[in-house]
Every structure is written in structure tokens, then in C-alpha cells.
Amino acid sequence: MKFKQDFFTQLPEFYSQVYPQGITKPEWLAWSDDAAQLIGLSQPTDELLLGLSGNAAVDGATYYAQVYSGHQFGGYTPRLGDGRSIILGEAIGPNGAWDVALKGGGPTPYSRRGDGRAVMRSAVREFLVSEALHHLHVPTTRALAVIGSDLPVWRESQETAAITVRLARSHIRFGHFEFFCHSERGRADKLIQLLNFTITQHYPHLSCDAAGYKAWFLQVVQDTAKMIAHWQAVGFAHGVMNTDNMSILGDSFDFGPFAFLDTFQEDFICNHSDPEGRYAFGQQPGVGLWNLQRLAQALTPVIPSDDLIAILNQYQEALVQTYLRLMRAKLGLSAVDVPSVEQDKQDLDLIGRFTVLMEKNQLDYTQTWRQLGKLDPTSKHSALRDDFIDVSQFDAWYQSYQQRLGAVADIPTWQTERNSVNPKYILRNYLAQEAIIAVEEGNLAPLHLLQKILTQPFAEHAEHEDLAKRPPDWGQGLIMSCSS
């Protein structure tokens, strides 16, 4: 890997230099060829294993942990920072630079009495979801590899340590800006320094002046809205949408007790530390705006409040238009009619009625959408009908759907198009758990198979139909913890 060190050299007050503590008996548990290409790597090597496990220096790496703050479950925590993630620098790839971070690399000045380690189960889950979201076309950070070890660590019980090698276009979070506004009061110079760095690195078409700052914040608002619209479309619940887990670039970031929906449930909670459902699936769009409002508060020394409010008011439109584009494609409505305010309203109603029917009939979200690929949209009798208990309500919806859809000249092509946007395979929690159990038993094959399938989620994979099934009784509604 070839590194540049722009963050390290230009923002010395934004991090602490710290070196990883190596894990014992490191081994490759998983590797992403796709992610490796981003930073010019090909195959995993023994030399790379030593470096990324913290047991040898990586040429050109500087090693540091960033400082930031954030709102966690609605309350402000003035000092957080990378408690178990150590960044090596920005690796230069064929199409840009990517931060390389060792998540689970050992304690840092921000570990807050923690051991700085990640356990194998959380490392595997983060690896799988990073790559799964990418191949579902959801903006996300990436995962290069998972490195296992025999190092014992204690959570609720004894587990083994592991490292996820994360790749990110940037690790700058909403919480970075909050830290230098609230926790370091009077440091508007540092806030401006961070803002100028972010624009120069990631928005080079913008200027570092008043007009550029407003244009940048609008881009952040729109990118955040688009990311969350993608989550809602694929049925993804993040679980811990604290502001310190929000990427300034609108990439899905910092995965813990996440889940994809099995049975559709608007108020689905995937995090057992969130009993009131602050971060429930259906709350995510509202939380996204709330988090942007907290970012806006941090930017008041730089951008006038009236301008910030005006820009925040554009969030809903960006969210709705992205969501409509994605959902119209899922339903096959993309090329039908010229969008208008009234058409948007009608389409949102059509989509909402369909998801309400899914919830009332306890249908699997992913499977129900996938069934559209078998549908003859010109037939009066839908193949979906048998899945619904309340057939009269379905019939009413289906009639509205056919009216909106209009004529379909080439049914096989229409069906193929539906299968190209409605995945057959998602990372169901029970599948991740089965892969983790197999790794604990020394069997990596289920993990590697699951990774392979998730990189082609729209393909049929007829020989692996079992990975598309609804969860068994023990795997339904699994709620994960933040323990990692």
C-alpha cells in the first residue's frame, strides 16, 4: 500500500498518535477482493497479515486515533473519539484515497476504560454488512478483511479478539464538528480548519468561503437524506444512529446491532439497548434530520442560522425523491408518467399501502418484493394474492397498482428488471449468526459462502436457495447488543 497522510499532517490537534497492539496467532478469516482493488491490493499475504494485525509496522503508516464528540441517544457526550480503531492513513488507490483503519487494534486515549478490542462476532458482522450494503448499491464504508486470533477478551463471557480492516472515504463524522464547537469552546479557528480540510479533500469543486460553506452543508444534507432513503428501501435498520456514527460524506458507518428486516415491521427495533425505539426502523428518516440539526448547531459560528435552517428544510425533499426513485424501480413504475407533486403523493400512497399490507399480513419484506419478478403485471389475478390473508385489501391495492403501472409490452424484460433491483439475498441476522458459530468451531466455509452470495444478491443462486429463506423460529426477530 502507498499512503498519503493529509489528515495526520494538516490536523494535528484532531487526533492522538497511538500504535496498535498486535493480536496473537493472527489468521485471515475473510478477505474482500473487491475492496482490495480500491487500494491497489490483490491477494492477502503473510506480510500484510502481520502488518494489519498490529504485529509489524506497515510502510508509510502513521497510526492515530481521532477525537470527536457526539449526541448518543439524544444526550451530548463531550468527548468520545476512536476507542478501538486506529487509522493508518489514506491509502492511494487507482481511483482515489481510502482511510485504512484497524477496528479492534487496541486501546487508545479515547478507550474510556475499554480494552480497545473487537470480538470476532462483531468483526465478522461488520465485514459482512459493509460488503452486503455495497452490493445492494447503498452508500457505505467498506471492509477489506477480518483477522482472527486466539487472544481472549471478556464481554458477557470470554470471547476471542479480531480486527476488521475498514476502508472509508473519510472517517470525519458529525461529531468532529460538534467537538470543536461545544467541547472546545472558543475554537472556531479549528472548526474552520476542519471545514476547509473537508471541502478541499472531498468537495474540491467548492470554495472555502461563505458561499462554499453553505453549498457544502447542502451537499451533506442531501447525501445524508439519500443514504437513509436507501436504508428504508432495502429494509436496513442501523440501530445506533448517534451523531458520532454519522459520516460527513453520507456513507453507512460504524455498524453494531444492525439488522435487515425479515417480516416487515415499521417499528422494528434491532438494538436491545434501545427499548424505547429511538432508532427503530421507521424512525430513521426523522433521526437523520435531528442529527443534521445537531450538526447545524455546531456550524453556527461559521454559517448564519437562517441559512442553516433554509438548507435543513431541503432534507425532506431529498429524502422523498430518492426514496420514490428507488421504490418506483422496485415496483416497475420508473418509466411511467412524468413526475409531479400530485404523482409523487399518489405513488407514496401506493407504496405505503403495500408496506402496510405486508405488515398486517406478516410478510417477509425482501421475499415479497422479489415475488414481483414472477408477476404477470397484465393479469387480473396476481401470483402475490395467495400470500395475503386479507385478499380484499390486496385486490384493491393491486387494482390501483395496475392502473398506475399501465401497459407492459415485454413481460419477461419487465420481470428481469424487477429482479435486478429487488434482491433475493440479504444479510439476515440468523445467517450471520450461523456463520459466526461455524467460525468458532474452526469452519470458515459458511462465512465464505455467505460472503460470496452477498456480493451477488440479485442472482438466483439456485443451489443455495436455503440462504434466501425466512429465518427459522430461533432466528426470528433477533435483537443484538452494542457489545463488541
Curated annotation (Swiss-Prot):
Transmembrane segments: none annotated. It is an enzyme of class 2 (transferase). Its cofactor is Mg(2+); Mn(2+). ATP binds at residues 81, 83-84, 103, 115-116, 166, 173, 254. InterPro entries: SelO. It comes from the Bacteria. GO terms for molecular function: AMPylase activity; ATP binding; magnesium ion binding. Keywords: ATP-binding, Magnesium, Manganese, Metal-binding, Nucleotide-binding, Nucleotidyltransferase, Transferase. Its EC number is 2.7.7.-, 2.7.7.108. Mg(2+) binds at residues 245, 254. Nucleotidyltransferase involved in the post-translational modification of proteins. It can catalyze the addition of adenosine monophosphate (AMP) or uridine monophosphate (UMP) to a protein, resulting in modifications known as AMPylation and UMPylation. NCBIfam families: PRK00029.1 (NF000658). This is Protein nucleotidyltransferase YdiU. It comes from Shewanella baltica (strain OS185).
